[in-house]
Amino acid sequence: MRLRKYTVVALVTVTLAVACAIAMEPVRTSLLRALGRFLVATDRLQRADVIVLAVDSDGAGVLEATDLIHEHIANRVALFADPPDSVDREFLRRGVAYHNAAAVSVEQFHALGVDAVEVIPRAVTGTTDESRDLAAWCSEHGYATVIFVSTLDHSRRTARIMARATRGRGIQLSVLGSRYSNFDPNAWWKSRGGVRVEIVESEKLLADMLLHPFS
C-alpha cells in the first residue's frame, strides 16, 4: 500500500513538472533538459577490473563497453546469460531457432575486436536481480572495481540500486549510461517515445528516492 501511494505521488509530480515545463515557454527548453538529465547517472569513471552490461542495454551497451575497452579503461567484459523462457522453449519445441541475446552480444564484441568476454551464468529479470547477482558474482571472482553499463534513461536509478547492493562488500561500482541509447535527455520531449520513457522512468526514480531516501 505504501509503495502504491509513493508511486501515485511520484507520477503526479512528474506529470505536473512536465506540464509546467511545456507551459512556461521562456524557460521551457532548459527545464525539459533538466528533467531529462535527472534520469542520468553522473558517476565518475575509473579504471576497472571488469565492465558489466545491463540485460536491457543491448547494442548500445556493447558499443559503449567496446569504446571503454579500446580506451583501456578495462580489459574484459561480462554480461548476463539469456536462457530461453517458456515462450522460447515452445518455439524450440516447434523447431524454431532461439536467438540468445547474450550470444548475439558476444558475437558483436568479437566482431569489434573484444575477445575477453564472459557470460555470467545467472538469469536475471530486472535491476534488483542484477544488483544482487552482480554483487555476489564480483565477490566470487575477486572483482573490486566495476563499471556497469546501462541505458541512459535507467542509469541514475540503477546507480542507486547498485550502491545499496554493493555497500559493505568492498566493491567500487560506477554506473555509466550508454551514449548510444535511444533516449536523448536533451531532446526527449520531441518524440512520443521519449515522453513516455521520461514519465515512466522519472516515476520509478522518484519512487525509489521516496522509499530509500538515504541511498
Regions found by a protein language model. Name each.
Residues R2-A41:
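N-terminal type II signal-anchor transmembrane helix
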Residues V27-K190:
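A structural signal for short, hydrophobic/glycine-enriched beta-strand patches
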Residues S191-S215:
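A transmembrane-helix-recognition feature enriched in membrane-embedded lipid enzymes
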